Amino acid sequence: MESVITATIIGASILLAFAALGTAIGFAILGGKFLESSARQPELASSLQTKMFIVAGLLDAIAMIAVGISLLFIFANPFISLLQ
């Protein structure tokens, strides 16, 4: 039973690491493209900023969903019931 709990914690940690890495890469690409497009067409900067914040919220949602799934696996582990 301890091996299942250990594997679940390691899996949840890997899930959180990949979600954080993906979110960081997404924010970096988003910020770079926003600055590039704002420099190219400054008159569209306010419209682009609104769209950038919407996409940033969606990117952040990916990490929050990963946190929720990890907490589910850590505290309400569905795999332990298979052992009993």
Swiss-Prot record:
Its main location: membrane. CDD domains: ATP-synt_Fo_c_ATPE. The record marks 60 as: Reversibly protonated during proton transport. It is found in: Cell inner membrane. InterPro entries: ATP_synth_csu_bac/chlpt, ATP_synth_F0_csu, ATP_synth_F0_csu_DDCD_BS, ATP_synth_F0_csu_sf, ATPase_proteolipid_c-like_dom, F/V-ATP_Csub_sf. One of its GO terms (cellular component) is plasma membrane. The chain crosses the membrane at residues 9-29, 54-74. It comes from the Bacteria. Disulfide bonds: none annotated. GO terms for molecular function: lipid binding; proton-transporting ATP synthase activity, rotational mechanism. PROSITE patterns: ATPASE_C. It is a multi-pass membrane protein. Pfam families: ATP-synt_C. SUPFAM superfamilies: F1F0 ATP synthase subunit C (SSF81333). Keywords: ATP synthesis, Cell inner membrane, Cell membrane, CF(0), Hydrogen ion transport, Ion transport, Lipid-binding, Membrane, Transmembrane, Transmembrane helix, Transport. Belongs to the ATPase C chain family. F(1)F(0) ATP synthase produces ATP from ADP in the presence of a proton or sodium gradient. F-type ATPases consist of two structural domains, F(1) containing the extramembraneous catalytic core and F(0) containing the membrane proton channel, linked together by a central stalk and a peripheral stalk. During catalysis, ATP synthesis in the catalytic domain of F(1) is coupled via a rotary mechanism of the central stalk subunits to proton translocation. Key component of the F(0) channel; it plays a direct role in translocation across the membrane. A homomeric c-ring of between 10-14 subunits forms the central stalk rotor element with the F(1) delta and epsilon subunits. F-type ATPases have 2 components, F(1) - the catalytic core - and F(0) - the membrane proton channel. F(1) has five subunits: alpha(3), beta(3), gamma(1), delta(1), epsilon(1). F(0) has three main subunits: a(1), b(2) and c(10-14). The alpha and beta chains form an alternating ring which encloses part of the gamma chain. F(1) is attached to F(0) by a central stalk formed by the gamma and epsilon chains, while a peripheral stalk is formed by the delta and b chains. NCBIfam families: ATP_synt_c, PRK06876.1. This is ATP synthase subunit c. It comes from Actinobacillus succinogenes (strain ATCC 55618 / DSM 22257 / CCUG 43843 / 130Z). The gene is atpE.
